[in-house]
């Protein structure tokens, strides 16, 4: 998908939408345990533009357990505040550097793709 509603998508956005969607749990990209997916529908025309894992209770439990382990015994609680700050600032830099792609994805998800999202 390089275009949506006749609007040329940023190459990174198009590549992202073309990839299979998975969930990040415990540092690994995984499918839903049941293997099911759900359509992500463009509200503007009702067309499916990608599919996402249909996480169920077991997937949620797995994610919560992994997050609890990471928070209680992972690297984050052992980090000095200044090191946490550096990571969060790096995240902010990455979000800013990729703002166009995030804006396109949000516009698509809300059915508002067009010149207004640029």
Predicted regions and their residues:
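Terminal low-complexity tails and localization/encapsulation signals of metabolic enzymes
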Residues: 1-52, 86-90, 118
């Amino acid at each position: 998908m390089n275009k949506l509603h006749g609007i040329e998508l940023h190459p990174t956005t198009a590549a992202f939408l073309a990839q299979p969607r998975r969930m990040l749990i415990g540092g690994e990209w995984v499918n839903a345990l049941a293997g099911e997916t759900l359509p992500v529908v463009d509200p503007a025309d009702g067309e499916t533009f990608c599919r996402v894992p249909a996480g169920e209770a077991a997937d949620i439990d797995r994610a919560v357990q992994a997050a609890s382990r990471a928070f209680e015994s992972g690297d984050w609680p052992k980090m000095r505040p200044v090191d946490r700050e550096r990571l969060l600032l790096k995240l902010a830099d990455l979000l800013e550097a990729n703002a166009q792609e995030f804006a396109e994805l949000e516009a698509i998800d809300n059915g508002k793709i067009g010149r207004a999202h640029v």
